[in-house]
Design a protein with these regions (language model features):
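GAF sensory domains
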Residues: 1-2, 6-79
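A generic structural motif
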Residues: 81-85
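Amphipathic alpha-helical "output/dimerization" segments
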Residues: 86-103
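Signal-transmission linkers at sensory-effector interfaces
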Residues: 105-107
Length: 107
């Protein structure tokens, strides 16, 4: 395994993006009202208590990380309900994996 997550969403890399462009089966039904963490320029562990994070996600203690999908204008957002926090090595792996996926998508 590269990293353990409960769900994944693909978004546009702008704050005005629709929620989500694509999402996994475990994606929470409660969408964020706004996406203040966008745009992203690199992989990052996100603050799970930020204003944009829905209360339902916070109640589940969902840890969040995201990475841009190369230069295709998309971002992958992953959630881990119940934690633990994403380690820096996991965030780096997410960025590396997102780069590979972006390379495949543009071909």
């Amino acid at each position: 395994r590269v990293l353990r997550v409960g769900w994944c969403a693909v978004l546009g890399n702008t704050p005005e993006t629709q929620w989500p462009v694509f999402g996994s089966s475990g994606l929470p039904e409660t969408p964020p009202e706004h996406l203040d963490f966008l745009p992203l320029s690199g992989p990052v562990a996100l603050d799970p208590e930020a204003d944009w994070v829905p209360d339902a996600w916070q109640q589940l203690d969902t840890k969040l990380a995201a990475a841009p999908l190369g230069a295709i204008g998309k971002v992958v957002l992953v959630g881990r309900p119940g934690g633990p926090d994403f380690r820096p090595s996991e965030v780096a792996r997410l960025g590396y994996l997102a780069g590979i996926v972006a390379t495949v998508l543009v071909r």
